[in-house]
Amino acid sequence: MSAPATSPSAPTRPLLAIETSCDDTACAILAWDGTILAEGVLSQTDHAILGGVVPEIAARAHLDALPALVAEVLKKASLTLADIDTFAGTTGPGLIGGLIVGSSYAKGLAMALHRPFVAVNHIEAHILTPRLPSLGADLHFPYLTMLVSGGHCQCVSVEETGRYVRLGGTIDDAAGEAFDKVAKMLGLSWPGGPALEKLATEGRDDAYPLPRPLKGREGCDFSFSGLKTAVSRLIDTQDPTGSRDALPRQFAADVAASFQRAVADVMADRAEHALALSPNATALVVAGGVAANKTLRHALEQVAANHGIPFFAPPLRLCTDNAVMVAWAALERLHAGETPNEIDTAARPRWPLSERTPATPEHVS
């Protein structure tokens, strides 16, 4: 069976990517040079009333949403599936149900059209996002990335495409997870990070002397469980019943601001240590969902300024999960001369950056 003919007006070698690692269903099409031809994201709302992401519900929602979303993105780009040169999908790390749904959908399209499939590491996609040409950043290897999201918190030296040195990571909670849990303690809506940041604008960030775990210590690891516990005990002084309905607004705002400042201080300290270990770093980058937090951005921007290097952060829409970053990560690999066809790779909830591609099904651990 021969592959369908492409339309004469199709841009050179467009790549379609799918992202379903958590609760956002996303699809994007990029041209070979990284130009964004079209993109779309559907955020699931069912989890809000449940106070967090339910993996089974998320996976089912991805399955329901993908056909229409892919069709919509193709229409925006004035393309058909036959015009797509390569398909890509997030294959890990993340929630296994969603990963299987999204990567299998992309693989199915690739197989039906006799096109290659690129298995993309979700963390790698976040790390490479600031190099997207349309962002206009003059970002060159090597650079240091502080990856801060709900599921991940890592400090990574980005040597080149496919070569990453993990300098440190969280030993307990990720920063985004801590944001969500503290927001829940304060009775805020889910997702907690944006709600907490908004409330913090009404408070004083020096109102409560919260701990800065691991600050000043050697290494680049993070720890946020102790900070989270300190916040819980502080809130209990005002609300011993745990109802969270009776918290004074100003108290809650001061707690939010103090917590946010503590996290930013820890991240800045860890970045300082990481830069000391990476004297050749050309820039400091922050990426991941929590990178949308303005206080965190400002703290890391100041660290970069202290070291005389530029600071880069993706626009807010590319900090949270999206398919543009997945498509760009796949293109970065293709630009580097790789010719992957990873149709047999298996989705997996854990996928260290040190492993080039996830294991085949019989070798998944």
From Swiss-Prot:
It comes from the Bacteria. Its EC number is 2.3.1.234. InterPro entries: ATPase_NBD (IPR043129), Gcp-like_dom (IPR000905), KAE1/TsaD (IPR017861), Peptidase_M22_CS (IPR017860), TsaD (IPR022450). Its cofactor is Fe(2+). Binds 1 Fe(2+) ion per subunit. The keyword Cytoplasm applies. GO terms for cellular component: cytoplasm. Residues 340-365 are annotated as: Disordered. Fe cation binds at H122, H126, D321. It is found in: Cytoplasm. Substrate binds at L147, V148, S149, G150, G151, D180, G193, N293. One of its GO terms (biological process) is tRNA threonylcarbamoyladenosine modification. It catalyses: L-threonylcarbamoyladenylate + adenosine(37) in tRNA = N(6)-L-threonylcarbamoyladenosine(37) in tRNA + AMP + H(+). GO terms for molecular function: iron ion binding; N(6)-L-threonylcarbamoyladenine synthase activity. Keywords: Acyltransferase, Cytoplasm, Iron, Metal-binding, Transferase, tRNA processing. It is an enzyme of class 2 (transferase). PANTHER family: TRNA N6-ADENOSINE THREONYLCARBAMOYLTRANSFERASE (PTHR11735), TRNA N6-ADENOSINE THREONYLCARBAMOYLTRANSFERASE, MITOCHONDRIAL (PTHR11735:SF6). Belongs to the KAE1 / TsaD family. Required for the formation of a threonylcarbamoyl group on adenosine at position 37 (t(6)A37) in tRNAs that read codons beginning with adenine. Is involved in the transfer of the threonylcarbamoyl moiety of threonylcarbamoyl-AMP (TC-AMP) to the N6 group of A37, together with TsaE and TsaB. TsaD likely plays a direct catalytic role in this reaction. This is tRNA N6-adenosine threonylcarbamoyltransferase. It comes from Gluconobacter oxydans (strain 621H) (Gluconobacter suboxydans). The lineage of its organism: Bacteria, Pseudomonadati, Pseudomonadota, Alphaproteobacteria, Acetobacterales.
